[in-house]
């Protein structure tokens, strides 16, 4: 990296930061997708449960018995919120990926422009 200009070194550092941001975004997305999947599974189970069955739900630090329809409604609402977050993260991911690819292309051009031909 001794022959690389400070500008290119800075761009390389930016690429590394973008990679870290991408990893963070992908981790968040994965967590939200897992939570949404678990919530969907819970709704499916609740729908198969008899209407007279006791259904419990966390309310803060307390677990309370609630009507099945209310629990389904709350969990469905949670799924919708998670899906909105996932879509938002996907937009961030796409924008960051585009910026990354553009900067990566610039860095490659800079580096390739500085290469000297081999004397073979």
UniProtKB/Swiss-Prot annotation:
Q: Which InterPro entries match?
A: PFD_beta-like, PfdB, Prefoldin
Record carries keyword Cytoplasm: yes
Q: Which GO terms describe its biological process?
A: protein folding
Q: Which Pfam families match?
A: Prefoldin_2
The UniProt keyword set, sorted, is: Chaperone, Cytoplasm
Q: What does this protein do?
A: Molecular chaperone capable of stabilizing a range of proteins. Seems to fulfill an ATP-independent, HSP70-like function in archaeal de novo protein folding.
Subunit info here reads: Heterohexamer of two alpha and four beta subunits.
Protein name per the record: Prefoldin subunit beta
């Amino acid at each position: 990296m001794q022959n690389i200009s400070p500008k290119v070194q800075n761009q390389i550092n930016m690429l590394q930061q973008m990679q870290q941001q991408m990893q963070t975004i992908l981790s968040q997305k994965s967590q939200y997708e897992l939570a949404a999947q678990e919530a969907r599974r819970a709704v499916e189970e609740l729908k198969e449960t008899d209407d007279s069955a006791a259904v419990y739900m966390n309310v803060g630090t307390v677990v309370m018995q609630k009507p099945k329809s209310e629990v389904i409604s709350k969990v469905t609402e949670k799924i919708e919120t998670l899906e909105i977050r996932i879509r938002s993260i996907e937009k961030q991911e796409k924008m960051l990926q585009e910026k990354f690819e553009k900067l990566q292309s610039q860095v490659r051009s800079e580096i390739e422009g500085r290469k000297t031909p081999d004397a073979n």
